[in-house]
Amino acid sequence: MRADLAVSYGEERLPRYTSYPTAPHFSPVIDAGTYARWLSELPAGASASLYLHVPFCREMCWYCGCHTQIVRRDDLIAAYQRTLRSEIALVAETIGRRIKVEHIHFGGGTPTIMAPEAFAELMAAMRQAFFVLPSAEIAVEIDPRTLTADMVEAMRLSGVNRASLGVQSFDPIVQRAINRIQSFEQTAAVVDMLRHAGIAGINFDLIYGLPHQTVASCLDTVRRSLLLAPDRFSVFGYAHVPDFKKHQRMINQGALPDGPARHDQACAIANALKEAGYVQIGLDHFARPDDSMAVAFEERTLRRNFQGYTTDQGEVLLGFGASAIGHLPQGYVQNEVQIGAYAQSIGASRLATAKGYGLTDDDRLRADIIERIMCEFSADLGDICARHGAEPEAMLKSASRLKPLISDGVVRLDGDRLAVANDSRFLVRSVAAAFDAHLDPGKQLHSRAV
């Protein structure tokens, strides 16, 4: 990507578009009653994906942007697990039938902070409440520093078949600056343990733009990671938002790479992974050519949801736990963020919905366009608009932010078909943002575009 474009567009604060509209536009107008009605209206034959949020960690990583908190007492974790089980039963009862489940994802926080038997009980509760297909993908986010052999065995017995390992960086200087000391040897031992247990799908999460990070240290992390041969990589740019995440104030802002340096790091990582045979997928994922995500990318069936890129084709995502977000045909719902408020609602047999968003026809049209841009670096506006009963000319007229992108060669427009230039793919969020009718550039709610 041209360095001048990285400077002119890369500093913009834009959504990652894991939803449209994005979470800052959720409103308390959508409440527990709305969610209950939406659940009861799910069409017969609908299948779902499940997301379970476990908002606990043993220590705080200073770069973290997730909803989590430090916990020392195991009884608090056990109580939260019981609340999750109650919420699962409550949602299933509200739906009124045992719907099919094709994907389950445990996120956090650190989901593997639960006791192994508690994890197994939670999986059993889901299988009782829903019909989890034998082919379902069951994925768990893992902190390699705290994973135990007993938890791996519980995961194996529960049918887990994919694990996402937080790596971020193997550079000890960077690790000290973000309060996450994690050796290569620790990570390698966990990968070996998982594979020995038959959990074959291995993802690594890497981050660029961290304090004291350089192109050389990023490439060294990639080199070491490749020795462990994960199936997928997620490569994110660090989002420094200390006004929203107070613990990020522990990071020395003066040690953060500037925009051009972030661009160089992102390009270096991408080039190294592609040279190693991985397929670049969308904004921030890389996968082996035979991986299901690479196949979905090639077949143009890739989707995007709150976990990032996914092969999940479902239109229903049920979120469980404090702060969890769900997606239904009618719109989005988000649970109470505070654990106490969440537990109080579920304890009273009430859905814990705090806010959400009801989709309009225009939202659905724009969401489809944005998702295709984010997943394929292109969009056939004529085809998408026809499916929604809209005119592509009107949509293009409303996308005034496209004009400079076209002038700068970031985007090519051939009739109604839009495509992001190959050397500008890191700016795909800027292209998607052209179709975002809710975006307020004056509000610094999101991370840098690069």
From Swiss-Prot:
* Record's subunit section: Monomer.
Cellular component terms, GO, for this chain's entry? cytoplasm
List residues binding S-adenosyl-L-methionine 1. 51, 108, 141, 325
Q: Please describe what this protein does.
A: Involved in the heme biosynthesis. Catalyzes the anaerobic oxidative decarboxylation of propionate groups of rings A and B of coproporphyrinogen III to yield the vinyl groups in protoporphyrinogen IX.
Query: GO molecular function terms here?
Result: 4 iron, 4 sulfur cluster binding; coproporphyrinogen dehydrogenase activity; coproporphyrinogen oxidase activity; metal ion binding
Kindly tell me the pathway this chain contributes to.
Answer: Porphyrin-containing compound metabolism; protoporphyrin-IX biosynthesis; protoporphyrinogen-IX from coproporphyrinogen-III (AdoMet route): step 1/1
Q: Which InterPro entries match?
A: Coprogen_oxidase_HemN (IPR004558), Coproporphyrinogen-III_oxidase (IPR034505), Elp3/MiaA/NifB-like_rSAM (IPR006638), rSAM (IPR007197), rSAM_horseshoe (IPR023404)
The similarity annotation says: Belongs to the anaerobic coproporphyrinogen-III oxidase family.
Q: What reaction is this protein's catalytic activity?
A: coproporphyrinogen III + 2 S-adenosyl-L-methionine = protoporphyrinogen IX + 2 5'-deoxyadenosine + 2 L-methionine + 2 CO2
Q: What does the UniProt entry say about where the protein is found?
A: Cytoplasm
- Domain called Radical SAM core: residue spans: 42-276
Which GO BP annotation is one of this protein's?
Answer: protoporphyrinogen IX biosynthetic process
Q: What is its EC number?
A: 1.3.98.3
List positions binding S-adenosyl-L-methionine 2.
63, 109-110, 168, 180, 205, 239
Q: Which cysteines are joined by disulfide bonds?
A: none
- Entry protein name: Oxygen-independent coproporphyrinogen III oxidase
Tell me what organism the protein belongs to.
Bradyrhizobium diazoefficiens (strain JCM 10833 / BCRC 13528 / IAM 13628 / NBRC 14792 / USDA 110)
Q: Name one Pfam family in it.
A: Radical_SAM
Q: Which domain of life is it from?
A: Bacteria
Task: Give the cofactor note.
Answer: Binds 1 [4Fe-4S] cluster. The cluster is coordinated with 3 cysteines and an exchangeable S-adenosyl-L-methionine.
List residues binding [4Fe-4S] cluster.
Answer: 57, 61, 64
**What gene makes this protein?**
hemN
Cofactor dependence is on:
[4Fe-4S] cluster
The record's keywords, sorted A to Z, are: 4Fe-4S, Cytoplasm, Iron, Iron-sulfur, Metal-binding, Oxidoreductase, Porphyrin biosynthesis, S-adenosyl-L-methionine
